[in-house]
Amino acid sequence: MPELPEVEVTRLSFAGRIAGARIEAVSMGKPLRWPLGCSPQQLVGLRVLAVRRRGKYLLVDLSDGLLLIHLGMSGSVSFGSSLSSPGKHDHFDMVTSLGTLRLNDPRRFGAVVYAGDEHDAVAHKLLGRLGVEPLSDAFDAALFHQALKPRQTPIKQVLLGGEAVVGVGNIYASEALFLAGIRPTTKASRISKPRAALLHRAIRQVLTQAVTKGGSTLRDFSNAQGEAGHFQLDAMVYDRAGMPCKVCGSPIKSIRQGQRSTFYCVSCQKP
């Protein structure tokens, strides 16, 4: 599943090129996870003002309303003036005066949803419970520790939940916990203030590095220009089960948490 870095990398790869474009046509393929919420014709004539990100959502600000785009499990966005005809897995095409924005989603867990504004009922349902942005100034170490204190579930699952901090995802949760020296099975409520500060710093560091590296391409992720990411080549623990830890040499262990694979070093990461 594309995580925060992949969504941010996608945004950066087309936001500047689509700003100011006039929407000329919209076509839909097979139904996605949620309906568009308006007639495609209603979007024609509107202008694209900007593209933002909230958690794992792309927010395309229009001259009237906005589009919320979620990439689901396997989705990707492309943008260009010479895209081929829509294929089997291309389910949303927005033709503009500056190029076509396309959502390709083989598994159709993604979505494109229209909302009147960021605070209406549709947008609130999707965005209302999202936690603080980890790369923003609002992500404060002390407040992060306070958010962890009442939670009795393992810290890895708290990070994936998106309410204490948004968008970290499976890959980067494993990597940040390794960097902070915290075992993923540790209850969030047991993490001390100093260790929470280490994790806070590690989350920011890992996500920043991932954006710089273009995200992670494990199967088929690419940005809106068709470029793959390379963070996975630098992973310390993710997808390295049985391989030696790059720090201490101990074998990396893999377990299942909440139906997701977790990777960690028994020696470097303490309960």
Curated annotation (Swiss-Prot):
InterPro entries: DNA_glyclase/AP_lyase_DNA-bd, DNA_glyclase_Znf_dom_DNA_BS, Formamido-pyr_DNA_Glyclase, FPG_cat, MutM-like_N-ter, Ribosomal_uS13-like_H2TH, Znf_DNA_glyclase/AP_lyase, Znf_FPG/IleRS. A zinc finger (FPG-type) spans 236-270. GO terms for molecular function: 8-oxo-7,8-dihydroguanine DNA N-glycosylase activity; class I DNA-(apurinic or apyrimidinic site) endonuclease activity; damaged DNA binding; zinc ion binding. Keywords: DNA damage, DNA repair, DNA-binding, Glycosidase, Hydrolase, Lyase, Metal-binding, Multifunctional enzyme, Zinc, Zinc-finger. SMART domains: Fapy_DNA_glyco (SM00898), H2TH (SM01232). Binds 1 zinc ion per subunit. Belongs to the FPG family. NCBIfam families: fpg (TIGR00577), PRK01103.1 (NF002211). This is Formamidopyrimidine-DNA glycosylase. It comes from Polaromonas sp. (strain JS666 / ATCC BAA-500).
